């Protein structure tokens, strides 16, 4: 028997079936580096319209985690898709390099700055440590396939950036937004530092819950305000608090001016509390018998004096709208140095703002003899005992509530009043302008707008000063008596900035003030506070972007970070930019969720559910991680697990196998020489190109709306349904069996060529390594990289007016699906092996029958059967299957008649008619020895 294998056009390609990504990707990265791929991209896109995504700098400490990977991959997908859309879209990666975590790491390595380690040595060690961390993180980001200007990254510790941060502060000072105040701020005892709002996390915490008596200094005055005779032995306010340790700093009692307050009589004692809470509070305290004496509005009691429970002074009653009746007694113990609301009341009433707590969280000497030098948290019980001994404690218990904690140490915070520098949110209407700017921005997801609006509405003034070493110096001089800034502050800060450009922040510490101030030095003090690291990163729109030539005279289009950055980088950038130029620094803000495990829990070493991006990449390849990111709706928390990654692997295989089939069937195809014009192509091939055009339009729309999971879904639909389950199955016979150079085969190859040209671009932003690999196997002359291409422009739509339009082929898809069902049932029953062992009868209503007959004897190629007959719908017997998709269609399936062709495997009646080729059908004989078969439709 003749071996007919050599007469077939079997698929052939060097493009491997298996990705072996963990091995191949590093090789590709090496080639990208040798190509200087990023510069090739910049050259190719020079002069085009611009799209700028500004990289929010990750902190230069520790290995990258899965959240970092999500962030960088999303940015890379956007930038690569924008280049496909014809944009010049440079990407400058950055790092946040100053701050306490690095200081603490360096302290562990060399000790604290002091006697053994000088400040300059410590700064050098911090800089070296941060540089080392950046190097490692950069390597990991590059491994993810992120294309950027890795040779020209920005770091907030770069000398020129440090200088520009000083200049940014100078502009904000010039615009009148900065002031110094002795104001309570979140303070971490372990950090020995003030914390920014973005560095505060909230956890459940158990605190003391106590009810304290503040007795009136003059019961006659209080009774008079209530309009009653002075018949009670005492009158006291009943105060509830969860921070007994702050009572030594109490300087007032706050009540709401418009709430009703009742004086109630218990035995011969009078207690004042909010009228709405009397019953619930007294019942809770175990007081069964009381009498309501009088009810009045809070404002009537303003400025009455009440004795501090154990200190030798009295305090006033003050009015405040922040007092509520949600919890407590409607009467608030007020310590202006230990709470933001208390501080504001203190300023309004000119109360003493006394700092009783040191940086270590211990009471300062002179606070109270029993408390001096003890930890505030350990002293809660001491204060409670003091209150009890003085008869000022009515009840003690505990309460579990949400409480601020340090994001680094996970330990509870205190509010502590220290001299700090602030950006005022209201002095120059910065809050009002920021809220206006928020409305102009595109927020993705849209509910982000409400989140940041609420945060801006409720945030306190921004404490921008820190009492540390490793950071950008504020570069200020303050008058010793007036405490005002030097009148030439702008000029001084510019001088310092120029010195910092040469020597870094060490220039400030080395600076001799006399060189700047001359004889005026006796009147001014050098401020050695450094800036909050959130000011560093939040001002990069000014300190970095304005200094980058790539971004010259262009606004930033997009910021993209995790959901926690609403109160972090998005917030600090918004405030600093609005303070400088009255407008937001970005046009669009995208927020992504956190990576969580299959149970919805955040990644945690203690839980043991951490998914390491390095391990995923080393095992599965970066493209699998990238595909997981793109496949997940990033606007919510993103679930990752071994099972989910397996699904990404399955998705990847489908895409890769589709690409491999296309490439393998382009064997021997040279586009310039063999391409068939669209009007001469077989109709099914025109339809395939039409489907690719429709898919591309939808994919581009999804990229434009940043819905990458929709991109993946549409690519999968195209590969699995339109191609894999229909077109690619059908064309195998024509591709393999028709003559090598026939129009029938070249038409098909032309379609496959156009499809792979389009498809490689669709996947390039997501599975970048695989797209790059495919690019090298597509026939024809081409540019050095898919990443300098734009969307493929040689697709086309079918003419909707022609009879074999989309609607026609959709009908055939439905018919084929029903036939496939019958074939699959026959396979399950083991009645057949291959679909080519069958012939099918389609009992059709007249209109459908007419449509089916349009394909003539090519219809059976669509159905993958050896034969097909079309009969009248009414002739169908009870054995025919009623189509579930088309009302006017019933189907029967039978064994094909004839013998099996050893070449095409169809069952035909004419096998053996040709004595030279007795094992094959007449169609195959024509394709081997004749002029070749003709195809019009399929």
UniProtKB/Swiss-Prot annotation:
Catalysed conversion reaction: tRNA(Ile) + L-isoleucine + ATP = L-isoleucyl-tRNA(Ile) + AMP + diphosphate
Subcellular location: Cytoplasm
Annotated keywords: Aminoacyl-tRNA synthetase, ATP-binding, Cytoplasm, Ligase, Metal-binding, Nucleotide-binding, Protein biosynthesis, Zinc
Co-factor note (free text): Binds 1 zinc ion per subunit.
Residues binding L-isoleucyl-5'-AMP: 561
Gene Ontology BP term (one): isoleucyl-tRNA aminoacylation
Extent of motif 'HIGH' region: 58-68
Keyword Manganese: no
Cellular-component GO terms for this entry: cytosol
Cofactors that this protein relies on: Zn(2+)
Record motif 'KMSKS' region, residues: 602-606
Gene3D superfamilies xref list: 1.10.730.20, HUPs, Valyl/Leucyl/Isoleucyl-tRNA synthetase, editing domain
Transmembrane helix listed as a keyword: no
InterPro entries from the UniProt entry: aa-tRNA-synth_I_CS, aa-tRNA-synth_Ia, Anticodon_Ile_BEm, Ile-tRNA-ligase, Ile-tRNA-ligase_type1, Ile-tRNA_ligase, M/V/L/I-tRNA-synth_anticd-bd, Rossmann-like_a/b/a_fold
Protein function: Catalyzes the attachment of isoleucine to tRNA(Ile). As IleRS can inadvertently accommodate and process structurally similar amino acids such as valine, to avoid such errors it has two additional distinct tRNA(Ile)-dependent editing activities. One activity is designated as 'pretransfer' editing and involves the hydrolysis of activated Val-AMP. The other activity is designated 'posttransfer' editing and involves deacylation of mischarged Val-tRNA(Ile).
UniProt xrefs under HAMAP family: Ile_tRNA_synth_type1 (MF_02002)
Self-association and partners: Monomer.
Record-stated family: Belongs to the class-I aminoacyl-tRNA synthetase family. IleS type 1 subfamily.
Domain remarks: IleRS has two distinct active sites: one for aminoacylation and one for editing. The misactivated valine is translocated from the active site to the editing site, which sterically excludes the correctly activated isoleucine. The single editing site contains two valyl binding pockets, one specific for each substrate (Val-AMP or Val-tRNA(Ile)).
Protein known as: Isoleucine--tRNA ligase
Species per Swiss-Prot/TrEMBL record: Baumannia cicadellinicola subsp. Homalodisca coagulata
Gene name of the encoded protein: ileS
């Amino acid at each position: 028997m003749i071996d007919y294998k050599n007469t077939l056009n079997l698929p052939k390609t060097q493009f491997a079936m298996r990705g072996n990504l963990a091995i191949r990707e590093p090789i590709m990265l090496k080639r990208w580096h040798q190509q200087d791929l990023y510069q090739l991209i910049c050259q190719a896109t020079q002069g085009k319209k611009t799209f700028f995504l500004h990289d929010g700098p990750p902190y230069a400490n520790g290995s990258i985690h899965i959240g970092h990977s999500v962030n960088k991959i999303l940015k890379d997908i956007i930038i690569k898709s924008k280049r496909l859309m014809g944009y010049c879209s440079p990407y400058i990666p950055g790092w946040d390099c100053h701050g306490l975590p690095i200081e603490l790491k360096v302290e562990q390595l060399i000790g604290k700055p002091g006697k053994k380690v000088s400040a300059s040595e410590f700064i050098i060690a911090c800089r070296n440590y941060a540089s080392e961390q950046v190097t490692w993180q950069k390597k990991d980001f590059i491994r993810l396939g992120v294309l950027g200007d890795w040779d020209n990254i920005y770091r907030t510790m770069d000398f020129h950036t440090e200088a520009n941060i000083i200049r940014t502060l100078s502009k904000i000072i010039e615009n009148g937004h900065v002031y110094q105040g002795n104001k309570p701020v979140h303070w971490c005892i372990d950090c020995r530092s003030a914390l920014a709002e973005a560095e505060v996390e909230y956890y459940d915490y158990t605190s003391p819950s106590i009810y304290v008596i503040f007795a009136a200094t003059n019961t006659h005055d209080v009774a008079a305000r209530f309009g009653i005779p002075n018949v009670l032995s005492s009158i006291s306010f009943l105060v509830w608090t969860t921070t007994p340790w702050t009572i030594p700093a109490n300087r007032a009692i706050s009540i709401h001016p418009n709430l009703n307050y009742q004086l109630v009589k218990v035995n011969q004692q009078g207690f004042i509390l909010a009228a709405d809470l009397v019953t619930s509070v007294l019942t809770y305290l175990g007081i069964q018998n009381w009498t309501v004496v009088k009810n009045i509005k809070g404002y009537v009691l303003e400025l009455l004096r009440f004795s501090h429970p154990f200190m030798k002074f009295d305090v006033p009653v003050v009015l405040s709208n922040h007092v509520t009746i949600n919890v407590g007694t409607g009467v608030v113990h007020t310590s202006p140095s230990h709470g933001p609301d208390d501080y504001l009341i203190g300023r309004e009433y000119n109360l003493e703002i006394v700092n009783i707590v040191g940086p270590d969280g211990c009471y300062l000497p002179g606070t109270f003899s029993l408390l001096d030098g003890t930890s505030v948290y350990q002293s809660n019980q001491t204060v409670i005992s003091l209150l009890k001994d003085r008869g000022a404690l009515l009840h003690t218990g505990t309460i579990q509530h949400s409480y601020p904690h340090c994001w680094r140490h996970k330990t509870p915070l205190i509010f502590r009043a220290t001299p700090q520098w602030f950006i005022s949110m209201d002095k120059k209407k910065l809050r009002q302008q920021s809220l206006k700017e928020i409305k102009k921005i595109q927020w993705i997801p849209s509910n982000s707008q409400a989140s940041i609006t609420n945060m801006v509405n409720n945030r306190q003034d921004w404490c921008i000063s820190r009492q540390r070493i490793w950071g950008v110096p504020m570069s200020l001089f303050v008058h010793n008596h007036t405490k005002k800034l030097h009148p030439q502050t702008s000029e001084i800060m510019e001088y310092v900035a120029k010195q910092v450009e040469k020597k870094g922040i060490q220039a400030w510490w080395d600076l001799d003030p006399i060189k700047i101030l001359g004889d005026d030095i006796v009147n001014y003090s050098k401020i050695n506070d450094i800036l909050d690291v959130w000011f560093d990163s939040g001002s990069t729109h000014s300190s970095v972007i304005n200094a980058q030539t790539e971004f010259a005279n262009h606004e930033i289009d997009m910021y993209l970070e995790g959901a926690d950055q609403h109160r972090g980088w998005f917030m600090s950038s918004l405030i600093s930019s609005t303070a400088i130029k009255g407008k937001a620094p970005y046009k669009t803000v995208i927020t992504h969720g956190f990576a969580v495990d299959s149970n919805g829990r955040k990644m945690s070493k203690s839980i043991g559910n951490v998914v390491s991006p390095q391990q995923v990449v080393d095992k599965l390849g970066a493209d699998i991680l990238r595909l997981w990111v793109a496949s997940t709706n990033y606007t919510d928390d993103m679930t990752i697990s071994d099972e989910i990654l397996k699904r990404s692997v399955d998705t990847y295989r489908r895409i890769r196998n589709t690409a491999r089939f296309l490439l393998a069937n382009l064997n021997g195809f040279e586009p310039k020489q063999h391409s068939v014009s669209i009007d001469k192509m077989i109709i099914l091939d025109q339809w395939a190109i039409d489907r690719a055009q429709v898919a591309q339009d939808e994919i581009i729309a999804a990229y434009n709306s940043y819905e990458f999971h929709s991109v993946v879904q549409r690519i999968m639909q195209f590969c699995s349904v339109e191609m894999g389950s229909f077109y690619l199955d059908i064309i195998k016979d024509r591709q393999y069996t028709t003559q090598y150079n026939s129009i029938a085969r070249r038409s098909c190859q032309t379609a496959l060529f156009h499809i792979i040209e389009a498809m490689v671009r669709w996947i390039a932003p997501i599975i970048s390594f695989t797209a790059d690999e495919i690019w090298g196997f597509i026939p024809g002359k081409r540019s050095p990289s898919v990443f300098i291409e734009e969307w493929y422009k040689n697709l086309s739509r079918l003419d909707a007016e022609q009879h074999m339009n989309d609607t026609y082929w959709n009908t055939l898809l439905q018919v084929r699906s029903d036939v496939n069902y019958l074939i699959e049932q026959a396979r399950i029953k083991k009645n057949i092996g291959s679909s080519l062992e069958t012939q099918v009868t389609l009992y059709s209503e007249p209109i459908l029958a007419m449509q089916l007959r349009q394909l003539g004897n090519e219809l059976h190629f669509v159905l993958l059967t050896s034969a097909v007959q079309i009969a009248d719908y009414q002739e169908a017997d009870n054995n025919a299957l009623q189509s579930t998709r088309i009302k006017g269609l019933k189907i029967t399936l039978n064994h094909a008649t004839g013998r099996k062709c050893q070449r095409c495997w169809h069952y035909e009646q004419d096998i053996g008619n040709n004595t030279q080729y007795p094992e094959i059908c007449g169609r195959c004989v024509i394709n081997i020895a004749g002029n070749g078969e003709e195809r019009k439709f399929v």
